[in-house]
UniProtKB/Swiss-Prot annotation:
Plays a role in photosynthetic sucrose synthesis by catalyzing the rate-limiting step of sucrose biosynthesis from UDP-glucose and fructose- 6-phosphate. Involved in the regulation of carbon partitioning in the leaves of plants. May regulate the synthesis of sucrose and therefore play a major role as a limiting factor in the export of photoassimilates out of the leaf. Plays a role for sucrose availability that is essential for plant growth and fiber elongation. GO terms for biological process: sucrose biosynthetic process. Activity is regulated by phosphorylation and moderated by concentration of metabolites and light. Homodimer or homotetramer. One of its GO terms (cellular component) is Golgi apparatus. This is Probable sucrose-phosphate synthase 3. The modification Phosphoserine is found at S126, S130, S156. It catalyses: beta-D-fructose 6-phosphate + UDP-alpha-D-glucose = sucrose 6(F)-phosphate + UDP + H(+). Residues 113-141, 715-735 are annotated as: Disordered.
């Protein structure tokens, strides 16, 4: 039946139309059927079948299908076609109803899970309240509020950002990864990734840079060195502002707004956002390098020698939110999130259509990876910025990590200073996007407002035509009568933009067709066949509908336009007394509605999403149901025919448009982020001291080779002793420095007496600081009991160390680190039994990244990094977490099923492996415990933010702070000691603990030793395989070895990876 596949798509369209117009009939099938079309007296089997199975179907479309079915002379073949069509309708309907049932079950289960999570959280929170405080429970705190009361409450405790903030000199980081991002001649609409978000982030960066108190704004995006796109997207830096754009007091050598393009993924290819996911960590490492360099530069310019850290890191969309969360954790600075378009909302819409299974949707849109990135972003974000209230209630409300009611409870407790037991919810703030009005030419509201239009179409006799924009001519050439009011729609040819419904509404309303023209600006195209299937389908349907309704001369659909033409297009529609329409099925905000209002165009817009808030502010048009063709046509007809209403809407739009200006947006934005809990790296090193240390240890490095080769040369010409010892000469400055390196001075300042540990660490830290490369051993070899497998692990560690030191070039300034889920005591016992000195390693990352130690203390003791605990402490609530995990793990089994009361516990706390930032448990029955993704979901529903993982061959479960991990610990070393992640070599097996995937991606070099790890914990990671969306299948940064590879082969793979670039 391959030749009849068109029927499936056509019948799906019929089933989805849900139009009204068929009168219900109760006729029953007869033995003899007359198939002729007549006056309605004969039985119509097609009509009967569709009416019985799918109610409310328009028979006009069905009749056209019927004509194709009966288009044959052979009655037997005709009957077979009829029977086949009927069976297809039946099958599609059953499938649709099955999907609807599954959808309702899924929604019901999620509702129950959310209610259970909220109930558990409020029970735990109420335990420490007094009787008087218990009245402030969930039901009493959550009361409906009027918009005015809500605004007063939200802003009452906030200090409004004003011009007296100039002394702040902030550094703000924005991230928008996908699409084609540049400051001028933006290619909006060139593909589905280059839309309104690109314009928004560029204009936001410019507007923020002009605000008092903001010194520099960096907008991070992807660098693309491909012949498929313009060369400008390969430029690493693009300046968005000039000195004239910024406040005079804020200008400086590095001030202003910039686009910073970071290479990640294949540099010679332009990739859609769905393909970028495996390379997100590469971006994080590249962006981190830029931020560290810039913080140092800004520190020299405006920070009095101290680093100037980003005030906030603001991610836009899921991919940038994921990146911003990791950067926020690495730098310990606040994160802000704007979703723009949300994955759960998109998934719900696609499932309701019933045309794709969940697996097909995920394959096309990578929707599971996107949703998990959005959940992680919610975990890490201090503030979530939305365009509308509807986005908070109906879209973010779908996520595990945000509960409106629980958020209000936690906020009320925090306001009273009551313990929240480690539970957190991000704050939501509605801040409508701004608009740049500098290019808007407001026309006088006079009858002569169409003078330019009159000159274009002929002008007055004897007068010379005025110069008019080229795009006007491009649009006007389509029209038979260009004097009619113009209905303007401007969007990508995306199915969700609902352009075809608009065209049907226009085509089927004769009064509207006679009174107005329709202009469709649907991006840019050269050949429809070269577009994506979705865009091509919309454009093809548009052309067919124009032909169907014979709209030639009434509809314009130009192929090309520039971004600079858009204001002229708005002005053309306004000069014809036209209307702007946005009929999208759901519109997250609707920036084009604001642009149209600024140019004096009334609007007709969808009632779903952001236009509701815009209409409430501007009062400049009408809202419609985007599924109702008749309502769309009536609203358009009302505005173009009633001139008084048209003028009223035009004036209202102009009067209220200031509410959406960029200065207003940025003022509210800065007010909101100023209320975030500011945090930054805890160490603040004196610049002069650092410089002196750098000079001192630079000399140390220059003399190290001489010392290592045991060339005992006397500095003053005397012959040294046989053991190479030298008596320092007080008159020789070189000897003085060397003496200080061997015997650190004992400082007696009172303020340093309580910092003996830090002083001891100071003598060792610079060794790590001066390393050029770091080899990190992160192999997870454990036996069935979770003990380290010495037979597999020890030879590999020894061979790696031997391979690095066998090459003179690599041996120079190379250090070693070990990264493991074992606690420090167990790790040191293992190394001792393997006869490997702890001093071989510059750092030890223990307990799944919750602790960092350095050798070098007195008597060979290991000393903890004094700043690391505070660095990873964000949103860590240990006691509340322990109680909740114990309940969940002993009441819920794998798959989310409830366990019987009285069943033996599945976990036992492992106090020996726990520390202040790691809760460890021993697993008694690994076949019954929840997977990581299920446990993380249940913890999020209860407001708990953390990083759970199974390790040591699934015999242990460890829970560490949200942004702590073995991979994040490497970034901490980069931030703390400026040892670039790109110069790290991470050695892993081909499987490991459930955080194994995080160790593979990034700009560090990964060496995967095949066959080294036979037992792992990956089976307990997630219910579906998403590895291809997290780890790149091919990468120049990944090399492979066999477990029995000789030392020379190991050396060769290190050399090969050292040459790798993105």
């Amino acid at each position: 039946m391959a030749g009849n596949e068109w029927i499936n798509g056509y019948l799906e369209a019929i089933l989805d139309s849900q139009a009204q117009g068929i009168e219900e009939t109760q006729q029953k099938p007869q033995a003899s059927v007359n198939l002729r079309e007549g006056d309605g007296q004969y039985f119509n089997p097609t009509k009967y079948f569709v009416e019985e199975v799918v109610t409310g179907v328009d028979e006009t479309d069905l009749h056209r299908t019927w004509l194709k079915v009966v288009a044959t002379r052979n009655s037997r073949e005709r009957n077979s076609r009829l029977e086949n069509m009927c069976w297809r309708i039946w099958h599609l309907t059953r499938k649709k109803k099955q999907l609807e049932w599954e959808d309702s079950q899924r929604i019901a289960n999620r509702r129950l899970e959310r209610e259970q999570g909220r109930r558990d959280a409020t029970e735990d929170l109420s335990e420490d309240l007094s009787e008087g405080e218990k009245g402030d429970g969930l039901g009493e705190i959550v009361q409906p509020e009027t918009p005015r009361r809500q605004l007063q409450r939200n802003l009452s405790n906030l200090e409004i950002w004003s011009d007296d903030k100039k002394e702040n000199r902030l550094y703000v980081v924005l991230i928008s990864l996908h699409g084609l991002v540049r400051g001028e001649n933006m290619e909006l609409g060139s593909d589905s990734d280059t839309g309104g978000q690109v314009k928004y982030v560029v204009e936001l960066a410019r507007a923020l840079a002009r605000m008092p108190g903001v010194y520099r704004v960096d907008l991070f995006t992807r660098q693309i060195c491909s012949s498929e796109v313009d060369w400008s997207y390969a430029e690493p830096t693009e300046m968005l502002t000039t000195a004239e754009d910024c406040d005079g007091d804020e200008t400086g050598e590095s001030s202003g707004a910039y686009i910073i393009r970071i290479p990640f993924g294949p540099r010679d290819k332009y990739l859609n956002k769905e393909i970028l996911w495996p390379f997100v960590q590469e971006f994080v490492d590249g962006a981190l390098a830029h931020i560290l360099n810039m913080s140092k530069v800004l520190g020299e310019q405006i920070g009095k020698g101290k680093p100037v850290w980003p005030y906030v890191i603001h991610g836009h969309y899921a991919d940038a939110g994921d990146s911003a969360a990791l950067l926020s954790g690495a730098l310990n600075v606040p994160m802000v999130l704007t979703g723009h378009s949300l994955g759960r909302n998109k998934l719900e819409q696609l499932l309701k259509q019933g045309r794709q299974s969940k697996e097909d949707i995920n394959s096309t849109y990578k929707i599971k990876r996107r949703i998990e990135a959005e959940e992680l972003s919610l975990d890490a974000a201090e503030l979530v910025i939305t365009s509308t209230r509807q986005e908070i209630d109906e879209q973010w409300g779908l996520y595990d990590g945000f509960d409106v009611k629980l958020e209000k409870v936690l906020r009320a407790r925090a306001r009273r200073g009551v313990n929240c037991h480690g539970r957190f919810m991000p704050r939501m703030a509605v801040i409508p996007p701004g608009m740049d009005f500098t290019n808007v030419e407001v026309q006088e509201d006079t009858p002569e407002g169409d003078g330019d239009l009159a000159s274009l179409v002929g002008g007055t006799e004897g007068s010379s035509p005025k110069a008019v924009p080229t795009i006007w001519s491009e649009v006007m050439r389509f029209f038979t009568n260009p004097h009619k009011p113009m209905i303007l729609a401007l969007s990508r040819p995306d199915p969700k933009k609902n352009i075809t419904t608009l065209l049907k509404a226009f085509g089927e309303c004769r009064p509207l067709r006679e009174l107005a023209n329709l202009t469709l600006i649907m991006g840019n195209r050269d050949d429809i066949d070269e577009l994506s299937s979705g865009n091509a389908s919309v454009l093809t349907t548009v052309l067919k509908l124009i032909d169907k309704y014979d709209l030639y001369g009434s509809v314009a659909y130009p192929k090309h336009h520039k971004q600079s033409d858009v204001p002229d297009i708005y002005r053309l529609a306004a000069n014809t007394k036209g209307v702007f329409i946005n009929p999208a099925l759901v519109e997250p905000f609707g920036l084009t509605l604001i642009e149209a209002a600024a140019h004096g165009l009334p609007m007709v817009a969808t009632k779903n999403g952001g236009p509701v808030d815009i209409h409430r502010a501007l009062h400049n048009g009408l809202l419609v149901d985007p599924h109702d063709q008749e309502a769309i046509a009536n609203a358009l007809l009302k505005l173009v025919s009633e001139k008084n209403l048209w003028h009223e809407c035009r004036i209202n739009g102009w009067k209220n448009i200031h509410l959406f200006s960029w200065p207003e947006h940025c003022r509210t934005y800065l007010t909101r982020i100023a209320a975030c809990r500011m945090r930054h790296p805890q160490w603040q090193t004196d610049a002069d001291e650092v410089a002196a240390q750098d000079d001192e240890f630079s000399l140390n490095d220059s003399l190290k080779d001489v010392q290592d080769m045991s060339l005992r040369l006397s500095m003053d010409g005397d012959k040294p002793s046989l053991n190479g010892s030298l008596e320092p000469n007080s008159a020789d400055p070189v000897k003085q420095i060397m003496s200080r390196m061997r015997t650190p001075e004992i400082k007696s300042k009172p303020e340093l007496q309580g910092k003996k540990q830090s002083d001891n660490l100071g003598s060792k830290y610079p060794v790590l600081r001066r390393r050029e490369r770091l080899v990190v051993l992160a192999v997870d070899c454990y036996d069935n009991e979770g003990a380290p497998d010495e037979k597999a692990m020890v030879p590999m560690i020894q061979n790696i160390i031997k391979a690095v030191r066998s090459d003179p070039q690599m041996a120079k300034n190379s250090g070693f680190a070990i990264s493991t889920s074992m606690p420090l005591d167990e790790l040191t016992r293992f190394l001792k039994s393997a006869k490997i000195q702890v001093s071989e390693f510059d750092t030890l990352i223990c307990s799944s990244g919750s602790e960092v130690y350095y050798p070098g203390g007195e008597e060979g003791k290991l000393l903890p990094d004094p700043d690391y605990s505070s660095h990873i402490d964000y949103r860590w609530g240990m006691e509340g977490l322990k109680n909740t995990v114990w309940k969940l793990m002993n009441t819920t089994a794998v798959g989310g099923e409830a366990r019987n009361k009285g069943s033996p516990s599945l976990i036992q706390e492992d106090q020996a492996s726990s520390n202040s930032h790691c809760v460890a448990y021993m697993i008694k029955d690994r076949s019954k415990v929840m997977r990581v993704d299920d446990l993380r979901q249940k913890l999020r529903l209860r407001g708990l933010r953390c990083h759970p993982m199974y390790c040591r061959n699934s015999t242990r479960m460890q829970i560490v702070p949200l942004l702590a991990s073995r991979s994040q610990a490497l970034r901490y070393l980069f931030v703390r000691w400026r040892l670039n992640v790109a110069n790290m070599y991470v050695v892993v097996g081909d499987r490991g603990d459930t955080d194994y995937e995080e160790l593979i991606s990034g700009t560090h070099k990964t060496v995967i030793v095949k066959g080294l790890v036979t037992l792992g914990s990956d089976a307990l990671l997630r219910s579906t395989d998403l590895r291809d969306d997290i780890v790149p299948s091919e990468s120049p940064f990944i090399g492979f070895l066999k477990v029995d590879s000789p030392v020379k082969e190991i050396t060769d793979i290190f050399k090969q990876l050292s040459k790798a670039t993105a």
